[in-house]
A protein has these predicted regions:
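OB-fold and OB-like single-stranded nucleic-acid-recognition modules
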Residues: 21-165
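Sec-dependent bacterial lipoprotein signal peptides
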Residues: 1-21
Length: 165
């Protein structure tokens, strides 16, 4: 029978490898089933809840003490990343405390955030009237662009033969 102490290095290595695959953003404690469109129709659905929403930034601006992002929402996948191939779930306004560099949080970037809905706000999308739920952001993750992903160093571990082009 193998010595339990001899298995410890293998277990530690396995834990490090599995942990390296995890997302940097944890939304487990937040409710991601309620869409912004549902909350725009009935704000009570979001009362006393931490919400997780994500999507594509469609507008952004810095205000005196916070940054406002208008986001077209999409359902979140198991990693908390917006699934942009799914049907959008409406738009929302995210208010992030403090200053965000809008060059980084530009139109088209993908974000996931958690927070609480504080109100709904009447506005417009183009000429069409629209009701936006307003999310007070607690945590936010800016997903890497395809270019950033392509330039990220890749680490491969294993035994075998491979070809890199």
């Amino acid at each position: 029978m193998p010595n339990p102490k001899s298995r410890m290095p293998v277990l530690l290595l396995a834990a490090l490898l599995v942990g390296g695959c995890a997302t940097h953003f944890d939304i487990d404690a937040a409710d991601d089933r309620i869409t912004p469109q549902q909350v725009a129709n009935d704000i009570k659905l979001a009362q006393n809840k931490t919400i997780a929403w994500g999507g594509t930034i469609v507008a952004s601006k810095n205000l005196a003490n916070q940054t406002q992002l208008e986001v077209l929402s999409y359902p979140l996948d198991k990693n908390g990343r917006p699934d942009r191939e799914a049907k959008p779930g409406g738009r929302f306004i995210a208010l992030h405390p403090g200053y965000l560099e809008l060059a980084n949080y530009a139109i088209g970037r993908v974000v996931t955030m958690t927070g609480t809905v504080t109100e709904t706000r009447a506005g417009a999308v183009g000429e069409a009237p629209y009701v936006f739920p307003v999310l007070a952001v607690k945590t936010m993750f800016l997903w890497p662009t395809a270019e950033e992903e392509a330039n990220k160093p890749q680490f491969h571990f294993g035994v075998g033969v491979g070809i890199v082009r």
